[in-house]
């Protein structure tokens, strides 16, 4: 926020800060309102500043001033936000990482200033919010966390500009901490894996009847109306030599064959050792065949690179099932996907699928509940089929999908090793 009273009025006070104003008024009339040498009680910033100090989120400076226009350092930002959500604030860096204010891939200098965009991300993550948000109200910032705070009425700026690279000031931080403390981020959301997830209204819902999934041994059938469910396997070199005629005779209708993948640390691409043998064997046995690529793409460019790799290798094969991107999240150590944001993941998946469709194939992407809710913006992917993985009695994913991977320990004639089993749903 720029210096001067006019700039301060650009912050739209949410209800929780208005509550702080009421509390500050009570304290004023009781003679217990905090005073600052540089912030008048008539200053529009005073309620939030007084509220933040009274609540213990922030402290005035030693000389009795508050310095509302001075940049806040990272230690002050971390401390204020952690205290606002009722958590211990010391040791600051350790607690910041524990509560995701600072991601495992990020370095932190507690004495450095903090950009407004970064402060928004810290506040959103402290509140267990995701960066999957709608259209930005700001001309200069599309950051998902910034937009999410606007949607939740926690941090809103007038004038259509957010100035994301400016440092957050102490006055702005006071307002943000008070807003975070009073926010009801659970309204309309559901809880998954320590996050509050807002339902995606434009993504079609799961259409399947949970009671219509019937099990016999380690295989499942779907007996509900409206769909025919084909039985399938997805395989790679890990399954070794496969007798595809025996697979076909065991009632399998289709096979998804791995083309290759991307290494989880180096990021290099590799071929599956059994791709050529498997795809030709499955086709010769009369199975419906599709392919997949194990992805660790973290950008649109890498998604396109993976698509080009796959398209070159499947040229000339008659595929009647989708070309799928199997993006999976690996966290910790040297995994290249650690801490990657949904926008970057979705960029890669969308680029791959668009390239596959442009080449004349049906595109599909793979996800489990974690990736579907936390790591992908499914609103951008509704043009493509979803391959959903959940090892349970029935799939309870909120959104639609066309293929369900229901076990990794299946037993099929002709395949000596445990194998992934799938159902593919075809509308009647």
How should these model regions be labeled?
Residues 189-232, 379-428:
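Functionally critical loop-and-helix segments that line ligand-binding/catalytic clefts
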Residues 73, 115, 145, 150, ...:
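Residues that flank catalytic or metal-binding motifs in active/ligand-binding sites
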Residues 5-46, 54-147, 151-168, 179-191:
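Feature responds to low-complexity, polar/acidic, surface-exposed segments characteristic
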Residues 129-134, 153-158, 364, 373, ...:
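Substrate-binding/catalytic groove segments of enzymes
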Residues 67, 164, 262, 297, ...:
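Positions that flank functional sites
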Residues 47-50, 75, 79, 94, ...:
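Solvent-exposed, polar/charged alpha-helical surfaces in well-ordered, non-transmembrane soluble domains
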Residues 225, 229-349, 357-358:
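Substrate-binding cleft of extracellular glycoside hydrolase catalytic domains
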Residues 319-397:
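Catalytic domains of cell-wall/extracellular-matrix polysaccharide-remodeling enzymes
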């Amino acid at each position: 926020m720029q210096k001067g009273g006019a700039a301060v009025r650009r912050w739209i006070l949410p209800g929780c800060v208005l509550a702080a104003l009421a509390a500050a008024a009570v304290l004023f009339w009781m003679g217990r309102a905090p005073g600052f040498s540089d912030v008048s009680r008539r200053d529009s910033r005073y309620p939030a500043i007084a509220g933040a100090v009274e609540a213990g989120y922030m402290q005035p400076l030693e000389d009795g001033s508050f310095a509302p226009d001075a940049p806040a350092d990272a230690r002050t930002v971390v401390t204020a936000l952690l205290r606002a959500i009722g958590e211990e604030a010391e040791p600051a860096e350790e607690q910041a990482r524990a509560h995701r204010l600072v991601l495992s891939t990020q370095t932190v200098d507690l004495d450095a200033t903090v950009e407004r965009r970064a402060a928004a991300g810290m506040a959103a993550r402290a509140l267990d919010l995701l960066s999957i948000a709608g259209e930005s109200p700001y001309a200069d910032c599309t950051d998902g966390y910034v937009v999410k705070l606007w949607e939740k009425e926690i941090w809103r700026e007038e004038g259509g500009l957010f100035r994301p690279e400016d440092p957050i000031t102490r006055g702005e931080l006071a307002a943000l901490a008070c807003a975070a403390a009073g926010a009801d981020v659970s309204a309309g959301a559901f809880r998954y894996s320590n996050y509050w997830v807002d339902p995606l209204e434009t993504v079609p819902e799961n259409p399947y009847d949970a009671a219509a999934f019937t099990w016999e041994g380690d295989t499942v059938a779907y007996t509900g109306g409206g769909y025919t469910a084909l039985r399938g396997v997805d395989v790679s070199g890990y399954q070794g030599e496969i007798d595809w005629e025996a697979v076909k005779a065991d009632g399998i209708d289709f096979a998804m064959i791995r083309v290759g993948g991307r290494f989880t640390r180096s990021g290099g691409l590799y071929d599956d050792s059994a791709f050529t043998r498997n795809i030709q064997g499955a086709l010769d046995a009369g199975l419906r065949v599709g392919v997949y690529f194990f992805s660790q793409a973290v950008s649109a460019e890498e998604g396109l690179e993976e698509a080009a790799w796959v398209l070159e290798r499947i040229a000339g094969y008659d595929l009647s099932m989708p070309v799928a991107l199997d993006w999976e999240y690996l966290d910790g150590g040297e995994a290249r996907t650690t801490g990657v944001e949904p926008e970057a993941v979705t960029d890669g998946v969308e680029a791959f699928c668009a390239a596959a469709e442009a080449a004349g194939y049906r595109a599909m992407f793979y996800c489990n509940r974690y990736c579907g809710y936390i790591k992908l913006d499914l609103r951008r992917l509704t043009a493509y089929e979803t391959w959903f993985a959940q090892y349970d009695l029935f799939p309870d994913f909120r959104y639609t999908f066309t293929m369900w991977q229901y076990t990794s320990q299946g037993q099929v004639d002709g395949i000596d090793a445990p194998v992934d089993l799938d159902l593919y749903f075809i509308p009647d």
